[in-house]
From Swiss-Prot:
Organism: Ajellomyces capsulatus (strain NAm1 / WU24)
TM annotation in the entry: 1326-1346, 1373-1393
Lumenal compartment spans: 22-1325, 1394-1477
Recorded name of the encoding gene: VPS10
CDD domains cross-referenced by the UniProt entry: Sialidase_non-viral
Ranges in coiled-coil conformation: none
Protein name: Vacuolar protein sorting/targeting protein 10
Membrane topology term: Multi-pass membrane protein
UniProt keyword Transmembrane helix present: yes
Signal sequence extent: 1-21
Gene3D superfamilies xrefs: 2.10.70.80, 3.30.60.270, YVTN repeat-like/Quinoprotein amine dehydrogenase
Stretch list, region Disordered: 1443-1463
Function: Functions as a sorting receptor in the Golgi compartment required for the intracellular sorting and delivery of soluble vacuolar proteins, like carboxypeptidase Y (CPY) and proteinase A. Executes multiple rounds of sorting by cycling between the late Golgi and a prevacuolar endosome-like compartment.
Amino acid sequence: MILRRLLLAGSLLLATSFTSAKKADGPKISATKFKDEPVNLFYFDDSDTVMFQDGKNGDVYVSRDAGANWDIVDGGTHWVTEDQAKSWREFTVDAELSRYEYPLVFHGKDSNRVMLLGHKCKGLDCKERTYYTTDGFKTVHLLMENGRHCAWAVSTPTFGEGLDLPKEVNDRIFCVVSGLHSSWAEANRLLYSDRFFKDEQGTEVPLDNGRAVSGVIRTASVQKYILAATKSARTNELALFVTDDASTWHRTEFDGHRVEEDAYTILESTSYSLQVDVVSTYSSTIGTLFTSNSNGTYFTRNIKHTNRNLYGFVDFEKISSIQGIILVNTVKNWEDVEKSNGVQKKVISKISFDDGRTFQPLKVGKHDLHLHSVTDATNSGRVFSSPAPGLVMGVGNTGGHLKDYLDGDLFVSDDAGINWRKALDDAHKYEFGDQGSVIVAVFDEGRTDKISYSLDHGKNWHKASLPDGVQIRAKVLTTAPGSTTLKFLLLGSAKADIGMEYYIISIDFAEMEERTCEEKDFENWPARLNEKNEPDCLMGHKQFYRRRKAQADCFIKKKFEEPAPEFERCKCTEEDFECDFNFVRGEDGKSCIPSRSLIAPEGVCKNPDDKFIGSSGFRLIPGNVCIREGGVDLDKQTERVCSETFKNPPAGQIVVEKSFFTADYYKDYFYLERKESSKGEDETVIMITSEQHIFLSRDHGKKWKRILEEEKITRIEPHRFFDDVAYFLTNNGDGWYTLDRGDTFRKFKAPLPPNQDKLPVLSFHPDRRDWLIWTGADECNGNGGNCHSVAYYTTNLGGEWHFLMRYVRRCEFISRDARGSSDKLVFCEQFENENPSNKHLQLLSTEDWFAEKRLHYSNILDFATMQEFIIVAIRGENPQDSLRIGVSIDGKTFADAELPANVQIPIQRAYTVLESRTHAAFLLVTINNMEDHEYGSILKSNSNGTSYVLSLSAVNRNSRGYADFEKMQGLEGVAMANVVGNVADVENGAAKKFRTMITHNDGAEWTLVRPPDKDSEGRSYACSTKGGKPTDACALHLHSYTERADPRDTYSSPSAVGIMIGTGNVGDYLSLKSKADTFITRDAGITWEEVKKGKYQWEFGDSGSIIVLVTESTPTKTLLYSLDEGRSWKDFEFSEVEMQIQDISTVPSDTSRNFLLWGKEVGQGKKPGLATVNIDFSGLKERSKHIPFNLMDASSVTEPNITANGPTRIAITAENYSTWTPLGISANAHDRIMNGNKTDLLICSDYNYEPQSDGSCARVAGLEPLDPKLVCTENPKAIEWYEPTGYRRIPLTKCQGGKQLNHIVAHPCPNKEEEFFKKHPRLRGIGLFFVILIPICLAATSGYYVYNHWDGKFGRIRLGETGSGGLFDRDSLLVSIPVSMVAGVVAVITALPLLVSSLWRSVSGYVRVPGGASSRRPYSSRDSFAARRNDYTGVVEDEDELLGTDDFDDDEEGDERNGQMKNNGHVNEAITIVFLF
């Protein structure tokens, strides 16, 4: 305590005060010096109490006299004050404050209700924690863990005004939490609870028409509105949802404008509308201002090209206390800025007096005035205005556009911005006091020792000096909230002997000899004037203020009493109405038209031409108080036509649109798919034809238009990670791109032409849409041999390119989310010493654009990046050496992959990295690389990609390295592969024969595919299965990846969960494709059935509720479609002329009801050229019935053993998707994951172990397992290691409980014995003593009691008598039953060792058991038994009781008994009986 007082005294010595004032002539000014910079300065409302924090050491200072004197506040953990810092109360929480968000979230109407956001860490493992209090931190309770963001429903004082909200809304809390089974942002959910999440997980908020939506990234509260932003994967576009009652939500509509992540700003709004500024498509520093209707649903454009900065701040401010006046800055040369990021913006200022409907320039006489605003604000608080009625100030200049801040002067208006005049030369900070009676300004272009002030609305100015000649650089000039006091605070910095020192200067006008204002000194001032200079109406009233006249020589002196407006009602006009629900503004901006089909009264509309009385489309803005009598009445109900109640009425028919092109064929096509959070209804397709013409369709091929006609586009590059984006490239380095699915296009210029190494020209960033790497060709114009590739990067869509590296082969951005690395992590392949002739390709990485670089490998073949792994193929030192594999998870540390010894790999020349999304990497290691004879083995890694085991041998691959391997979309762990079934013959030069294999546990076990029982015509197949299981002679085989013309034509769909379609045959091998039939499965490949004879192309639609088939390679004019998962099929004629169909397509998610056929007419009456046919199933009537979605479980199938370990559980992994239900019924379901028994998902796949034919797991002969103790060195937190068993947990499994075959015998890690025995406590010491002693004591006590009360004591002989019938008679049940039980237990314990040894001998004769007797042959005949009877072990003497021999036999019977004991056959029989028992 003494030390603390000394420190306090020392700090107060530093705070030396100076005073300089003349009581009558100017303000009283005092200065307090501080060693370190004050930060976080704020006032308590309606008081002179001010606080700030020392910017260096965090000490808190408080002043109770508006900054004249300061005291330090005693420290502690967390403190709260309820009396303006007069007293403090300490509180604690078991967490550190949040680093990413403001830690305190306040209730809008109850100051005692607060949430605290924090986190608690154990080592590197941190969990977000949210706490709450309802009594001002007297008690603190944990709300939830891992809540990403929480907020009160009632977050503002105005929320719920005018609504009769339920009481529970006052307790309601919204929290953004991670997905059920995914931590990705697109899986986030919004939950709410009215009980602080007690005894509940919370309820998902029904954001979209009563349906929960995934991907919630943030919520925000503004005035009476709550907004929630959601984002889907693979797009930057957001969906915003809004509510004004915390219960009913609506999706916002921005008049066709896109809203993107980090590209919108919610501005200061009113109680009757929201203001949102949305970034323009091509510039992050130019926006468009939107204003909503009263419920925040429909937004209309107010003004385009608003000025904003990269931090999201917008030059927008509402004039304080006056409704409807808005000051904005816009960009005059917006076209030039959007064309090039290097163009300097020309900013101009505008003002609106009608709530943003119209804008006009600011005027100083006849000159336009432009003011610096929010984007370069130099003071705290509001930029232009305060509660002082009508007074507005700003720094700027007159002329054509805004100049630099240092070139500006101070301007003032006292009529709310209608007229302006110059107040002071040069830029100044400024503040208002005493309701505008006093204005203070301080020079803001350098150091100053004076302040300026005005007492007449800025017309005349006076100066006052700072005390003792102090010269400061002004940082903050402020006053109490409300601008009603005569006291101001000025914070500034000054030069010290060493470094800087800081001053807080108190400026007090209270002691100036100014009288108190009287009634004659005030005027009734209209807040808004119309074009006729008359008081204007807004929201049904005119607004007036009683304010001091500019020339009055008095002070108002009403401390903490803000001026109150007076209102005068007006008659209703058109401006008092807005569009009603389900209506939007028409193109004229005046009418309101239906946004969707109207709802007519029941029984009214029988014909489309009938009429009914309904909404006019308008309604009075809620809160508007205009006088209806004698005014406009736009919301009067009107007569409507019944045809408006049907928008796109179901026709019950399939609609066809055919289009023709002059080209012979298409080179490629791409879908730019609209995601759930994206606006609009487009289904965009882009095609490049054989003539290099580019066509675009926004309606899935119904109508096409040619785009970029003047450009010589040679290739189209869709963005790998964002489905809205595509690039159109030429051979000279010019290019175009679209960010909005072809709605608009913008040109860019690359630094070099595309490379000539047949490598990807563009590399895309997984998370940053605008970041690109361009690999171009340099020095390639002449015939010289120095042509090489050079990489450049851009972070603004090609607006500016920066050199990255030369002599590269390929560069890639590396995803940050899975690795926790920098988003600037880039990997490049570069030729060593920038010399391609040496053939040494280095793998380098950087996190700062190669200002510094890291060398990982000096001689690689290639590298591949996946969601979780970076895999590198490394060359050996000599050409004949095999390739090695390097693996990294974090992009920094690589480890060599350990390949299994039981895979015989020759000199390794090729690896194929297969799809790896289930926490394990799949590699195809080529075994035979001879042309047309290629095959290899699939290896599967552990969770860090370093240890591999054999998954499947002899997998087919082609000469390009692609393998017949495909994972099922939508389900974890299901995959199919084609293997070479005649390996021995292939090694001798024979052609390959294929068989299809399937796995349901992510490659741990593979089986042949079970064939259907009968074909599509009801006939049995020529071969037969064995007990329903496939055999080598009879299984289903399907054509796979290497035979596809388009690799996008996969077996399965991400939304048609569980369904796969393929072409193939039933038999011993896969036959020719020309002889294939078409098959379908609905249970993820467990059972199959033949759909049709012949080979068909297929496509899924409407999340699997529609399946379309069209013949492959055969001219046709009909297709087949099914609405019940392929159980029944219907024909549909799509063309009058037969067509050769090359492909059938739909959107990649398979959620559309539109399909597109690609081909050409070949029949009679054909038209030349390429043709596309759109098939639209949208007209089919939907059923209103809902069928629940069922979790598929392989155990529900009649087959007894799907895999060696029993029935397989299949888990749906999509977090939220529209899924199919039979008969064309669309439903929406969240995923469900069944956590299986752990034994089912532990497979014999540990390093150097392999499964045996009997199902056991054994180590490969001569090989050793990985050192199990490595877990202790690799993970410092590990406390134990386990002896290897050969079993390994499948990386994707979510199983819980059950047998842990991989964790049987545990040992402590070095120096972790204490933690180990805490986890695995042993019985020892006093505990062991009592465990032994207590049973003995109980037994002795019981025995003593029974001995003294039992009538059958030792020594008594009773011949032929029964017991006495007493309680403890020996025949009493109370005695006989316990005696029997004890005797049985003793007999079992005695016999157990003998029984086990006997069983071991029996079992070891039939089952191979490693070690022991496993090597002995079972006896198959009497002779074989007799030949080895000496090896048989006799039963020891003590076994007689076990086998039932009577102890009471006399000695003469002993020999006979002993002789019987030597009869090994009888003994074996007896033992067998006991074993069965």
